[in-house]
Amino acid sequence: MRLRDDGSVPDDNPFVGRAGYRPEIYSLGHRNQLGLTLHPDTGALWLHENGPLGGDEINLIRAGGNYGWPVVSYSREYSGPRVAFRTWQEGMEPAEIVWLPSIAPSGMVFYDGDRFPNWRGSLFVGALRTGMIRNTGHL
């Protein structure tokens, strides 16, 4: 969903005027998105999602992108079977990072400080399941 500060829909939202879609939609095919951050240099929007049983994802969000849930997934249902029978499909955006088993991502931030220059541009992701902060490296 993408809105202006006053709640109105930007004219350049990717689904404005498309039959069968609400104009507020910016991207679709998400399951349980809990964390968003902007890349400090590019301004790109990054999102993390929790899968039901593994298949947690980091996604680079593109206008109008379809991220596949539940058609494509690395996840399993809590009862055991796979959510989907494929992990990729043409026309759907692949995840940048997938965790198996689940780490239960709980927030993320790009490091853009000066104290640790080797970490500049690295994405750090909090993990509820392991109690760790994971460095994904430079993205």
What are these regions, as identified by a protein language model?
Residues 1-139:
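Beta-propeller domain segments
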